[in-house]
Amino acid sequence: FLGNGEDALGLVFNFAAIEYQYNAHFFADILKRNEEHFSDPYLPTLVFGNHDVPRSIGRVHGSIEKWKVLAMLQFSARGVPVSYYGEEIGMTNGDVAVADAQDPIAQANKLIPKFLAHLLGVFLTRDDCRTPMQWDSSPNHGFSTSKPWNPIGKSPERTVAGQERDEHSLLTFYRKLLAVRKSHAALHSGLAEEIKTTGSILSFDRVYGKEKASVYLNFSSISA
């Protein structure tokens, strides 16, 4: 689907990482396939979530530390990082009752019990991933002065205002990643080379002219 802008699209969403497995080999395979199918001058995208699927942080059980590894991968890999709103503060799914859902899909799923849906991996309503952005701890979390049709998600303590004051927060981490990416040509424009795994470590180089950035990502539960 990619082309030079005259015969195809300049950029496409790649959903290969939507249902990711949290391990080095899974992401090494994605990066290698990106280089095979979207080699320079084309650009891949690295997308973890969107408005049609459960919030991606749920795949690591809401772990902020694991999500930081994924964010570092997203902003250091070659291509365009795409974040779904709220990922930068670790927002989790809501718990919208099917009877109260606005999503048309919920009406088709209204006879499926929740416990059975969880067992089968069925997403009863997309409203769960479309809850209001959590700006602060004021009423409706600063999203609106009126009552929104979806309730706040199940992690109401994760707000922009709260994380802005915390130098170790996920939001601060995202801002640091953006600043580093912006200030190094190797990270925002460089080629991707030497993609490999060593146990639970994923590593690759980003190279632009004489500048090289070596990236190492630890997917294990042991600090390296």
Language model regions located:
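Active-site-adjacent loop/helix micro-motif of nuclease/hydrolase catalytic cores
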Residues: 26
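Extended redox/cofactor-interaction regions of prokaryotic respiratory oxidoreductases
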Residues: 14-16
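Catalytic-domain carbohydrate-binding cleft regions of carbohydrate-active enzymes
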Residues: 44
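Loop/helix patches that line or flank the sugar-binding groove of alpha-linked glycan CAZymes
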Residues: 2-3, 8-12, 22, 30-33, ...
